[in-house]
Amino acid sequence: MAELRARLERARVDEEAISRALEIVAEQGYLDDVRYARLLAADRRAIDGWGAERIRERLQHAGVERDVIDATLEAFDHSSERDAALELLRRRWPRPPESDPERQRAFGLLVRQGFESEVAYDAIREHERVVS
């Protein structure tokens, strides 16, 4: 909703019209931040391999409230985060990184995708363990 409000304000729509428009679209179920957050999180995780932190940043940028973001990301426990990081790692590196520079590149990729350092390290170690 915050994103729509910002767009209408930039278009210089008066405040009363903005409030009424937001009320109507909310009543009709066209805008639902909870649903939006869940769908974005699921899509970005499945399609792009994003971690929880990158999803959090995107939702904050879209103006989703903190409590909605927190509730959405509660589903991402350490185990599911590690599994998602491992899946991304396997797509990019079918064979585990063999040298320290390769491990650093893999680590950098995972962190840029929004995975915490601990999750990235765990995924790299697991990738090396499973293939070895």
Where are these regions (language model features)?
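An alpha-helical, amphipathic repeat domain used for nucleic-acid recognition
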Residues: 1-132
